[in-house]
Regions:
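Enzymes that bind and transform nitrogen-containing heteroaromatic metabolites
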Residues: 1-221
Length: 221
């Protein structure tokens, strides 16, 4: 089915949180040196597409372009069931990279038309409620996209793991403790309830860059 490499990754505090409990975004950006930025942007430049969920657009308003290194800009793909991406968001107003919004049947025609007016492509998934990720990866494969980076957030990462679509997983562990029982974690969703259902990983490489530990895993098949 697949023939498309899916890499998932993200940043978390030493206690596994990706943001404080109030979920105010972009919290790790301030801890990153130019050296860290280069590593991240080199990774972005190496993939054909970046996938994020609409919640990440709403919280962080990222541009998802390659800035710190030379390289191509990947296609930006937003999973947005109800077409909630704001028309003012950076992802719709930066022309260096093309954008695809993936909505579902529950998105209103008006919202879809408004997004199309921003000269972005809108794909409507056949699924009524949530974007069908297997269908999406097939669609991307048909466009000759071979390598995808899923940047988040926690619900999106969970959906890819649940559908058994992940090939590689990287984690940046930041030297901070956030705490917060309701703070978001790297992979959220309902979670696996049995040990045998958990996703097994194999550590491929690790490196420390100015107090940030970067771990890179492959998913055991």
């Amino acid at each position: 089915l697949k023939n498309i490499k899916v890499i998932i990754g993200g940043f978390m505090s030493i206690d596994g949180k990706t943001a404080p409990a109030n979920r105010i975004g972009r919290i790790f950006t301030k801890f990153m040196t130019p050296q860290h930025q280069k590593i991240l942007h080199r990774l972005r430049a190496s993939v054909d597409a970046i996938i994020i969920g609409v919640d990440t657009v709403l919280a962080d308003d990222p541009s998802l372009t390659v800035r710190e290194v030379k390289g191509k800009n990947p296609i930006r793909v937003v999973l947005d069931s109800s077409a909630r991406t704001p028309l003012t968001s950076r992802i719709l107003n930066t022309e260096e990279a093309s954008t695809i919004i993936v909505a579902t049947q529950k998105a209103s025609k008006e919202k879809i038309e408004a997004l199309k007016s921003k000269k972005v492509e809108v794909i409507v998934s056949s699924s009524p409620e949530r974007v069908d990720l297997k269908e999406l990866t097939e669609e991307l494969k048909n466009r000759e996209i071979k390598k995808v980076l899923v940047e988040g957030g926690g619900e999106v990462r969970w959906s890819f793991f649940k559908e058994n679509l992940v090939d590689e997983f990287f984690v940046w562990i930041m030297p901070y403790v956030w705490g917060g029982r309701n703070a978001p974690t790297l992979v959220d969703g309902e979670g696996f309830l049995k040990t045998e259902d958990a996703v097994p990983l194999k550590l491929k490489k690790m490196k420390i860059v100015k107090d940030i530990l970067i771990l890179w895993f492959s998913v055991k098949r």
